[in-house]
Amino acid sequence: MSYQPTPEDRFTFGLWTVGWQGRDPFGDATRRALDPVETVQRLAELGAHGVTFHDDDLIPFGSSDTERESHIKRFRQALDATGMTVPMATTNLFTHPVFKDGAFTANDRDVRRYALRKTIRNIDLAAELGAKTYVAWGGREGAESGAAKDVRSALDRMKEAFDLLGEYVTSQGYVLRFAIEPKPNEPRGDILLPTVGHALAFIERLERPELYGVNPEVGHEQMAGLNFPHGIAQALWAGKLFHIDLNGQSGIKYDQDLRFGAGDLRSALWMVDLLESAGYEGPRHFDFKPPRTEDLDGVWASAAGCMRNYLILKERAAAFRADPEVQEALRASRLDQLAQPTAADGLEDLLADRAAFEDFDVEAAAARGMAFERLDQLAMDHLLGARG
């Protein structure tokens, strides 16, 4: 298998990823700003399928209408010249100080109304550029102190905002769905909708739930100490995996945004295995930050590494699934039984079945080994290149 990516692999990058200048809370930028046109051209050369953006990534905040149109025109020309697509867009509702207390859930009503108008304006651009998914990350929606935010009212306002946005895209006839991106712990101390589970529960309360799904990110779920592939599996099970952000993370700490494959490599293997086996057809979107130690050559090497690592893990996962010893180990672990209904015969027959309870040999069942260690070691062998 070739590890050289092509557009058919559907790899995408945000302008803000390779465009991150290395500025953090403790240090200034270490790299110059990248022109979005340059980003499109370089990513196309690397084999990417598309590029995504926040409104302020493409059009500097405060630009006049004339300046805005000029930025859009140059960007569109770069897309046309390279064949790159824009499968997703989003709104920056977190950088400007006006959003210091949030956007859709800010205590100030006028800020909430401004946030909705800012979002709607960029939705129009997203639809114009062909995006099918609109991501919403509520990074400033939350609090640091208990009395500062009535969470129930804040969730009411969050619901109101998404219902209005759903009404808007429906009224405009846009073929666009929303993907809510959960994240815990930063930048607000306590953020609303911090995990996939929170977001899935919230979506069920919306007026048009079919328009809303989730955009899980590797590092975000791991920041909460959760299993990312399990979160992805539940989103798939619910029919709500509308988009996905791939990067690397090493356990419960700040949002590292390492290149994909760095950090928890075992989790990355199972995530790729799941996406490929489940038939996920959306973009494989990399939301990472090239370390501030790197110059621009290092930025592009980091982006290329994201795609290469995905393709290597895709090959490793396929070899694992095709290995006859693995298939035997899966049977020994009785995974095939998990796929069978527990009581397809119905409640009445279950209650009448003495083998299910009265005559069930608890001790014999307890003594049965599950053979999980053999199965897991085979996975490790494939991951480490010792098999296949």
Swiss-Prot record:
Q: Which UniProt keywords are present, listed alphabetically?
A: Carbohydrate metabolism, Cytoplasm, Isomerase, Magnesium, Metal-binding, Xylose metabolism
Q: Which cofactor does it need?
A: Mg(2+)
Domain of life, per UniProt, equals Bacteria
Catalysed transformations (reactions): alpha-D-xylose = alpha-D-xylulofuranose
Q: Which family does it belong to?
A: Belongs to the xylose isomerase family.
Name this protein carries in UniProt: Xylose isomerase
Main enzyme class: isomerase
Principal place of residence:
cytoplasm
Q: Which Pfam families match?
A: AP_endonuc_2
Localization recorded for this chain is:
Cytoplasm
**Under which EC number(s) is this enzyme classified?**
5.3.1.5
- Per the UniProt record, the source organism is Streptomyces olivaceoviridis (Streptomyces corchorusii)
| Gene3D superfamilies assigned to the protein according to its UniProt record, in alphabetical order | Divalent-metal-dependent TIM barrel enzymes
Metal-binding recorded as keyword? yes
Q: Which residues bind Mg(2+) 1?
A: E181, E217, D245, D287
Active site, UniProt feature = H54, D57
Which terms in the Gene Ontology molecular function aspect does this entry carry?
Answer: magnesium ion binding; xylose isomerase activity
Q: What is its quaternary makeup?
A: Homotetramer.
Q: How is the cofactor bound?
A: Binds 2 magnesium ions per subunit.
